Structure formats: structure tokens, C-alpha cells
Curated annotation (Swiss-Prot):
Keywords: ATP synthesis, Cell inner membrane, Cell membrane, CF(0), Hydrogen ion transport, Ion transport, Membrane, Transmembrane, Transmembrane helix, Transport. The gene is atpF2. It comes from Cereibacter sphaeroides (strain ATCC 17023 / DSM 158 / JCM 6121 / CCUG 31486 / LMG 2827 / NBRC 12203 / NCIMB 8253 / ATH 2.4.1.). GO terms for cellular component: plasma membrane; proton-transporting ATP synthase complex. This is ATP synthase subunit b 2. Belongs to the ATPase B chain family.
Amino acid sequence: METEVHEAAGAAGHAGQAVGMPQLNFDYWPNQIFWLLVTLVAIYFLLTRVALPRIGAVLAERRGTITNDLAAAEELKQKAVLAEKAYNEALAKARAEAQAIVAETRAAIQAELDEATAKADAEISAKSAESEARIAEIRAGALQSVSEVAKDTAEALVAALGGKSDAAAVDAAVAARMKG
């Protein structure tokens, strides 16, 4: 029976320890605190020696890349401003040259036009003078023909009316009538 009592006492002792959660048992707290501190120190060293330097290196590289990109962008902006300035200067120069060429071409065309106009005016004046001379000849010929026709007609009328025609009197009468 003694063994039964001893077993019952041992079971009762173990039963007291099994009650509740072992994490809340004050008998294990010093051991749990020790392992908590060891774990925290291990995490601290892992973070400070491995993870944080890598993160810091990535951040530094990113900062460097951003700084380099900003510097490159500023440099490209300066180049773009210079290129735009050179483009505007070249454009202005090209416009000035084009305007000079246009003015030169206009002057050449105007000179050719003036020359052609002067030549045409000279031809027209020559033809006009020639035409006026021909008209004057035709007029003179026509007046002479009219005078002869008038003399012949007057002599024929005088003869038809039964009179004798005097050539000098007919000439004088026709000349007086032709003058006005």
C-alpha cells in the first residue's frame, strides 16, 4: 500500500505542475526571459549586421541613381536649351537668306519686266509712228483721189447741164470746197 501512496503522491505532484499554461508558470519565467533575451540579441545582430546594411546600401544606391539621373536631366536640359537656341538662330539666318533671295529674284524679274516693257513700248511706238505715216499717206492719197473724183464729177455735171466746163474754174471750186 505504501507504493500506492507514493504513486498517488507523485501523481499529485505532477498534477500540480500540469495545471494551466506552462508559459504562465512562474517556475519557468527566468528560463523564458533568458531565451527571449538571446532571441532578441540574435535578431538585433542579424538586423544590424546583415539586413540593415543591405537596406542602407540599396537606399544609398537609389539616392545615387536619383542624383545622377537629376544631374543627367539637368545636363540634357542645358543641351536642349543650347540646341533650341542654335536652331532658332539657324532658322532666323535661313529666313534672312530666303528673304534676300526673294528680294534679289524680285529685282531681277522686275528688271526683266521693265526691259521687256521698254522693248514692247519701243516696238509699239515704232509701229504707231509707221501706222500714223501710212495713215497720213492714205489720207493724202484719199484727198487727192477725192479731189480728182470731185473734179471729174463737177465737169460731168457741167457738161450734163449743157455748159462748157472750164478746167481752171472747176479746179478752183473743188479746192475751195475741200478746204472747208
